[in-house]
């Protein structure tokens, strides 16, 4: 189970945690992923996807079909 958005492909970013004395240690900035059921009208069923919050906002504008086509995923596998 990867921490990656199903539609946008967003994943963790490598960054530094910087202390007051400016010592830097590596850390991960995880994407804000949410497990979400989305209605798929042409499939006439719910599809459970792991989406970033940015993808959820974009989904409301573009729609599931268009975003899945851009991402190159087959919704029948979800």
Curated annotation (Swiss-Prot):
Keywords: Ribonucleoprotein, Ribosomal protein. The keyword DNA-binding does not apply. InterPro entries: Ribosomal_bL28 (IPR026569), Ribosomal_bL28/bL31-like_sf (IPR034704), Ribosomal_bL28_bact-type (IPR001383), Ribosomal_bL28_sf (IPR037147). It comes from the Bacteria. GO terms for molecular function: structural constituent of ribosome. It comes from Trichormus variabilis (strain ATCC 29413 / PCC 7937). Pfam families: Ribosomal_L28. PANTHER family: 39S RIBOSOMAL PROTEIN L28, MITOCHONDRIAL (PTHR13528), LARGE RIBOSOMAL SUBUNIT PROTEIN BL28M (PTHR13528:SF2). SUPFAM superfamilies: L28p-like. GO terms for cellular component: ribonucleoprotein complex; ribosome. GO terms for biological process: translation. This is Large ribosomal subunit protein bL28. Belongs to the bacterial ribosomal protein bL28 family.
């Amino acid at each position: 189970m990867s921490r990656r958005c199903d539609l946008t492909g967003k994943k963790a970013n490598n960054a530094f945690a910087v202390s007051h004395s400016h010592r830097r240690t590596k850390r991960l900035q995880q994407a804000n992923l949410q497990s979400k059921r989305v209605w798929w009208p042409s499939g006439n069923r719910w599809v459970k996807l792991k989406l970033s919050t940015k993808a959820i906002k974009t989904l409301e504008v573009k729609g599931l079909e268009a975003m899945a086509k851009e991402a190159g995923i087959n919704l029948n596998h979800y």
